[in-house]
Structure formats: C-alpha cells, structure tokens
Regions:
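Hydrophobic alpha-helical core bundles mediating ligand binding, dimerization, or RNAP-core interactions
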Residues: 20, 62, 106-109, 180, ...
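DNA-contacting interfaces and partner/effector-binding or oligomerization modules
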Residues: 71-162
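Charge-dense, low-complexity intrinsically disordered segments
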Residues: 10, 52, 96, 100, ...
C-alpha cells in the first residue's frame, strides 16, 4: 500500500526528519519552515491542537504539550522557571536540528497563541545556539529579535501562565474558533497544494 494514502500509517522519528529534509530540498525557499509551521496550525488534531484549544489555562496547555510531545515527535521540551520568567527549552534528537526546531516551534506557538487567546503574550527573548538559514524572515514573522546563546529557548513572563483561552471547548462555534477549525478557501487551497507535495515526497522516500 502507498503510505502517502494510508491514514493509519506511522513513521519513525528518523523517517520524519528525513521526510522534512526532503521537503525542504524540494521547496528550496528559506521561508519553508515558516510556511510549514503556519500550515500546522490549521491541522485539527494532535496534542498541540487540543492542548492549546481545550486546556483551562496557558500553563495547563504548556504542561500537557511537554508531557506528551516527545511521544510523537523527534524532539522534547523542558520548562525552566527563573524569577518572574519561565523558559521553554527545545531539544531535538539530532542536535544539529535543535535551533531550526526551536524557530519552527516558536512560529507555530505564537500563531496558536494569537488564535486561541484574546491577549496573547509576547516573548521576552528567543535564543538559538546555531545559525539558521533565513533567520531574518523568522524574526519578521515572530516579531521578535533572535539572539545566539547557550540554549534553544523562548522566554515569557510567568503571568502568561494564567491566561485563559477564548474557548475551553475546541469546537465551540464562535467566529474565532470557526476561522480556526474551518480555514478560508485560500488557506484550504494552499493546504491542498502542500498536501500534494508531501504525498509525493513520502512516496519517494519511504
């Protein structure tokens, strides 16, 4: 059977990384990670979708994501508290991918915060350990300067942990939720195009 058409098929973390690398090579554009991360915010499944849409507070959503993220992805997250701040540290199974993983995750995270929270928190700092192609594009998308340091992390004020989402139920029929669960036609068309590319890459690499 063609794994690209099998909705029950699973892939290993290494296969996932290989597929992502192949997709990046096929696309060849420096904003690939940004576009892929934003596309993920329209996927109505997974721990991130349900955690950020259905948890009672942002703190609960983060803890749920930390607890289960590593079970289904080639990276894991650690939370560190320091005074009035908290940091999310991202670690990839392949160390050379950790900085890209952090930027990809932050683009996704900030978009999910905009979707799910009336007053989404602004990062205090974003740090990476290694250069990433197209870094200026990521900074523009995230609206935050990225600095180089000893970790791949994002920092927020602890006050953000108590924020409540627009709706506790992911499928509550409010305008904001409908926009999220049912993307507009333009986004749907973009998603279909990306889906075709992904299927082609999966077929060639697995």
């Amino acid at each position: 059977a063609n794994i690209a058409e099998d909705t029950k098929a699973t892939v290993s973390a290494e296969q996932f990384v290989r597929l992502f690398e192949s997709a990046y090579q096929v696309d060849g554009r420096p904003d690939f990670g940004i576009r892929a991360a934003l596309t993920y915010t329209h996927v109505p499944c997974g721990i991130g979708f349900h955690a950020f849409g259905g948890s009672p507070t942002l703190g609960d959503a983060i803890e749920l994501t930390i607890k289960y993220k590593g079970d289904i992805a080639p990276e894991y997250i650690k939370r560190l508290d320091e005074g009035e701040f908290f940091e999310l540290h991202y670690h990839h199974e392949r160390e050379d991918k950790s900085s890209f993983c952090l930027l990809f995750a932050v683009v996704w995270l900030l978009e999910m915060l905009k979707i799910n929270y009336k007053n989404p928190p602004t990062p205090v700092a974003i740090t990476i350990t290694d250069p990433v192609p197209g870094l200026l594009l990521y900074e523009e998308q995230m609206g935050c300067k990225v600095t180089f340091g000893a970790s791949n992390s994002i920092r927020f004020h602890k006050s953000a942990l108590s924020l409540k989402p627009l709706a506790a139920d992911m499928f509550t029929a409010t305008k904001d939720r409908n926009d999220f669960v049912n993307p507009d036609k333009a986004n749907a068309e973009k998603g279909a195009q990306l889906s075709d590319v992904i299927k082609s890459i999966i077929s060639k690499n697995l």
